[in-house]
């Protein structure tokens, strides 16, 4: 029987390990942490609340996609549509991504239709930019100077550790601008969360009889000689000892506090230049 080594017990590692095991291969999964799930790992706290160890992870996709079909082998689903609001300087909150309501809140205008919204957007957008060279130019081209200052420039600096002018355009281009009042963060037709969280999915995957899971173990390059195939799913720069330099991952510090407050959306963004990014 052919043998496969998978480095990392996160989402990519789980898919590779399961598919190889289902194909009749013997699979060993090596994970340096003491838990499965990678960044999707979650757990229940003392109050029965689901806590995401490395920040919330949401699932949104086309309902006919392979990812929905594959994950549905291991979980039932609970409907969840994510919403984000930004805290303005006067304490009010407004939807993100920018939509018609956001424009009305910031500029104190009344935009009755998508057509009126498009006309208003064109009046504040930087029309001189044809092909944005960085994320800052993406923001200027899509929402103009004032909204770039309010929502994106300070937040990007906190989030990435460098200004939007130094971040490639593809990053900023991920953020949509809407002419309707849809305040959902995503528009996919399948927006759900696993009924019991993400961790039970991984536990089911790695319980496959042809998968051997080894936790608390760093990958040793010498081990590759004992396997027919090796799959790396962790940070590739770390795998090569950073000898080609470090890749620019964004960094977020998570602080857990209990406060008596009910937010108006699941995620509240601090888009100013203060210490925090969101809660």
Regions found by a protein language model. Give the residues of each.
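Conserved beta-strand segments of alpha/beta enzyme cores
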Residues: 26, 76, 210-212
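Glycine-rich FAD pyrophosphate-binding loop
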Residues: 21-46
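Mid-domain catalytic core of redox enzymes
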Residues: 23, 217-279
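Dinucleotide-binding Rossmann-like beta1-alpha1 core, especially the glycine-rich loop
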Residues: 47-126
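Short aromatic-enriched loop/helix-cap "lid" or pocket-rim segments at secondary-structure transitions
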Residues: 40-43, 98-99, 227, 244-245
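Short glycine/proline- and charge-enriched loop/turn segments
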Residues: 44-53, 182-186
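Active-site/ligand-binding neighborhood in enzyme catalytic cores
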Residues: 92-229, 233-240
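N-terminal Rossmann-like FAD-binding beta1-loop-alpha1 element of flavoenzymes
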Residues: 2-29
């Amino acid at each position: 029987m052919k043998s496969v080594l998978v480095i990392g017990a996160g989402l990519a590692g789980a898919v590779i390990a399961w598919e190889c095991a289902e194909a009749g291969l013997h699979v060993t999964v090596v994970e340096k942490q003491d838990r499965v799930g990678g960044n999707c790992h979650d757990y229940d706290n003392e109050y029965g609340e689901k806590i995401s160890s490395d920040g919330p992870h949401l699932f949104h996709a086309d309902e006919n996609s392979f990812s929905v079909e594959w994950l549905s082998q291991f979980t039932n689903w609970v409907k969840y549509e994510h919403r984000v609001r930004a805290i303005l300087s006067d304490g009010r909150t407004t939807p993100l991504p920018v939509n018609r309501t956001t424009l009305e809140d910031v500029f104190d205008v009344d935009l009755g239709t998508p057509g009126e919204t498009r006309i208003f957007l064109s009046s504040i957008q930087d029309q001189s930019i044809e092909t944005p060279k960085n994320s800052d130019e993406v923001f200027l081209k899509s929402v103009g100077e004032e909204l770039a200052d309010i929502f994106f420039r300070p937040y990007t600096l906190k989030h990435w550790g460098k200004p939007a002018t130094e971040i490639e355009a593809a990053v900023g281009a991920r953020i949509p601008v809407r002419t309707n009042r849809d305040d959902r963060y995503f528009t996919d037709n399948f927006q759900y969360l696993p009924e019991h969280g993400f961790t039970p999915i991984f536990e089911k995957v790695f319980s496959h009889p042809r998968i051997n899971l080894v936790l608390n173990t760093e990958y040793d390059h010498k081990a590759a000689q004992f396997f027919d195939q090796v799959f790396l799913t962790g940070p590739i720069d770390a795998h090569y000892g950073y000898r080609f330099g470090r890749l620019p991952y964004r960094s977020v510090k998570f602080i857990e506090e209990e406060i008596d407050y009910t937010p108006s959306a699941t995620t509240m963004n601090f888009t100013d230049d203060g210490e925090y990014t969101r809660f």
